[in-house]
Every structure is written in C-alpha cells, then in structure tokens.
C-alpha cells in the first residue's frame, strides 16, 4: 500500500498523486491506503472519492477521530482517538461515502492518543464497541 500523509511536511500528501504514480508505474500490485486523519489534513477533496476508478484502487482504510478543539494545523497523531460523535473530522461521513461509492474493503483502527493507550482491557473493549456501533450507523 501507498499511504499519503496529510501533514504539511509530507512529500506525499495526496491520494490523487499516489494513484497517478501507481498508474504511471504500470505496477498493478499497489493500492492506495486511505487514512481518515490524513485525508482530512491533506489536499484531496471529498468529491475525489466519488470516482469508481479511485474506489477500485483503495486497498485499506485507516480510521480514527479527533475530538480536540484545536486548529487543524495543530493536529498530530497524539490527538487520534476512536471515532465517535465528537469527531471533528467526521470520519464516519467519509467511510459512508466510500461505501456508497462501492468500497468493500477492510478498515483498520488507528487511534494513537495516550487516552486510548492507557485504557484497560474492559474499557477498551467497550470503547471499541461504541465506536463500531457509531460507525455502523453512519
């Protein structure tokens, strides 16, 4: 997979650029990895993901949420939590759009916040269940 990183310092921040490079390489074994966090930060517009050719080239989707009330330019991996109603990135909306457009692949949670890392097993199971239930309703 090729994963565009939406950070301003990233040399590859756009899924569109990644897909163009994959196409021009002629190597059919590559897919783009869409990360809801990096898609929110990067230059790609939601309309980009309405193209069946794009959807067919997505290999995996990483999902996380950001509940923090900070400037978008200050978002960091440490702010990534399990997606829920307070997610300012609206990751569930992007997931629902991808599925409406035909994505049938896998999702992978990527919450890096210390809040999630410090959860006990029972608390984490409940938090994951709540997040999955929230995402299923999108």
What are these regions (language model features)?
Residues 12-138:
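Histidine-acidic metal/acid-base catalytic patches
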Residues 1-10, 117:
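Active-site-proximal beta-alpha loop/turn segments in soluble metabolic enzymes
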């Amino acid at each position: 997979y090729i994963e565009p990183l939406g950070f301003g310092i990233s040399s590859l921040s756009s899924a569109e650029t990644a897909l163009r490079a994959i196409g021009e390489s002629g190597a059919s074994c590559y897919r783009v990895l869409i990360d809801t966090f990096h898609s929110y930060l990067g230059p790609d517009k939601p309309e980009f993901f309405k193209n069946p050719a794009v959807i067919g080239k997505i290999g995996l989707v990483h999902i996380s949420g950001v509940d923090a009330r900070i400037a978008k330019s200050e978002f960091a991996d440490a702010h990534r939590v399990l997606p829920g109603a307070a997610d300012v990135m609206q990751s569930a909306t992007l997931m629902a759009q991808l599925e409406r457009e035909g994505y049938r692949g896998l999702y992978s949670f990527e919450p890096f916040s210390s809040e999630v890392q410090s959860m006990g097993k029972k608390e984490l199971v409940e938090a994951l269940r709540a997040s999955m239930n929230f995402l299923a309703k999108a």
